[in-house]
Amino acid sequence: MKDEANRTNIKLLLQALLVGICTAVVVGLFRFGIEKTSGFWLYLFQLAHQNPLWFIAIIIGFIAVAVIAGYFVKQYPHVGGSGIPEVKLQLQGKLSLQWFPILWRKLIGGILVIGTGLFLGPEGPSLQLGSTIGQGVAQGCKQNKLKTRILLATGASSGLSAAFGAPLSGALFVLEE
């Protein structure tokens, strides 16, 4: 009986490790995408200072980003905003979301919106990206509700830690929730 409990705990620990590693990769990609997108927009503004016709391209680009972001939010309203309220509700068992549609829309939409310079920091979206990865691993491993919430919290704390570059901030978030 004790061996089975130990094996279950080791499996959960390995799954949590997988969640942490995947979250670090995805949030790293997220931050890299934001940096490159911001650089692209800065380059367009430099071109526009040399030739005002580039402002037309900038306006078209802003409209395209707004349309894409609006489309993502219309498809899945929980993609909009920071994602922290959704993660809290999921941890409390009051909200159930499909993890993969949220993951890729939040990743691409967040890169576009934050990289364009709109008022949203990467911390909340990173937290939600991590929690969706935790949910995905839990579903893939067919975990029960309790262990799913543990992996959700693991992903959320990993995302927050990766966003701030501070592991203790993620651990404190999980303890608070």
Language-model regions, residue ranges each:
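Alpha-helical transmembrane segments and immediately membrane-proximal extracytoplasmic
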Residues: 1-177
